[in-house]
Every structure is written in C-alpha cells, then in structure tokens.
Amino acid sequence: TAFATPIAIAIPPKVDRFIIDTYCPAVVTKSFPQSGITVFGAFPHTHLQGQSVWTKIIRNKKAVEYLFNAEAYNFNYQFENILPKPIKLYPGDELATRCVYHTTNKNEISLGGEKTKDEMCMHMFMYYPRMKNFYGCSTINSLESWSRLMNSSASSFDFEVFRKWLIELKWTPELSEQWQNFYNNAPRVVVSGPTNNITLTNLARLPDYEDLKPAECKRSIINTAIRSVFLSMSFTLTSFFVTIASRFF
C-alpha cells in the first residue's frame, strides 16, 4: 500500500500507463505466528484513475503466487472479493503490490489524498487469526529522494512548498518518462505496525525478485468451451423454432 499523500502518490497527466510499486519486506511479517495466517478475502482500492491492482507473495526472493490480482479494476465497481481458496502467509513472507493508473483524460497532476479526485493505492485483506500487533504496511518515497528531484538544499522538508512545486510542474512526455523512472528507483520508507507504535524501515530501492512465469494460453480449452457454448445455443434455437412451428402447423 502507498500512503494517500503526495509524498507517496504523484501521477503525471496525459499518461496511458503509470506504475506505482510498493513493497512489504520480511521484517514486517516476522511477527506472524509460526503456523501462519490465512487470507480469505481481498479489497483492492484506488480512485478514478486506477486501472489495476495486484499483490504478489514473495518467498525467498521468488514470487510464488498472486495474493490477489484485480487486473481490470474499476472505481465504480468495487467488491470485497472472497478468494477461490484461502492462502497462507508465513513469517518472513514479503508482499509486492502494484497499482497502475491511466491519466490521458486529465490535464493536471493526480496527488495522493482522500478526495475522489485525488488518488490512492491500497490493497486490504481479510484474514485469521487476528493479530493485535499488526495493522498494515505502507510505503512513501523518501524525503531525501524528493529533495534531490526538486534540486532543493533546504535543511528541512517543507510540505507546502513541495505540494506547490508538484502542482506547478509543466508536463511533457519526456518529464513523464523521467517521473516513471524516478518512481522505479527511488528509495522507500516502509511504515508498519499498530498506529500507536509504528516502525519505519528504509529500503534503498525496491527489492528484486524472480517473477511469476507468464500464464500460457490454453487455446484448445478455450476453443472447446466456445464450441460447447455454440452447440448449446444452436440446440436452444432449434428447440425454440420447433416449438414455434408446432404452434402453427
């Protein structure tokens, strides 16, 4: 999850596809019970510009499966999704989450925030047994990385100056491409733990991992399914016409 703040989410306008990746490292899940927790539901959430949200389970630097994949996300059509089968998470597991945005309909930057016109990147899960010392895992781009991008040498980070700078940026395709590169490589700060006792973990960059292999298209299965549907429709239509004919003859 990325915090709903401009420090975490600042998406250029007029971009067909902008990616924000977040990462929950092993240090966050080390307090999970040794027997694991069982995830049985998922609720992905962005605002109007979001197109897809997914979270992968990373185990020993290798993606083992999707925890959930909302490949075709729509803000106006949101669900609490019950998983086809429960999934176990264990101490030391890591979670990689990606939100993808489409902003070709916008003329100004989209910033993280709670208003519908702002943006979010969240993936919430239902699980058991309950853990009292675990609330969530969120990331922001480090303040130092933003200061370097702004070419600022100020001794402290001024959030109002930062927000004003973002809003006044003049966007070009080249700047949007540079912006994506910044997001791909910027150091992150991971915020985790209960709200009254949060833990901050620094990531020099998003960790690398061996990704899932692309799923193969089962063309023969698809063709068989289409053929079955076609035959079923043909039989239904034939029965319909026979019924109609019997009424007139």
Show which residues each predicted segment covers.
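C-terminal GPI-anchoring signal of eukaryotic secretory precursors
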Residues: 217-237
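Beta-strand-centric surfaces of beta-sandwich/beta-rich domains
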Residues: 1-221
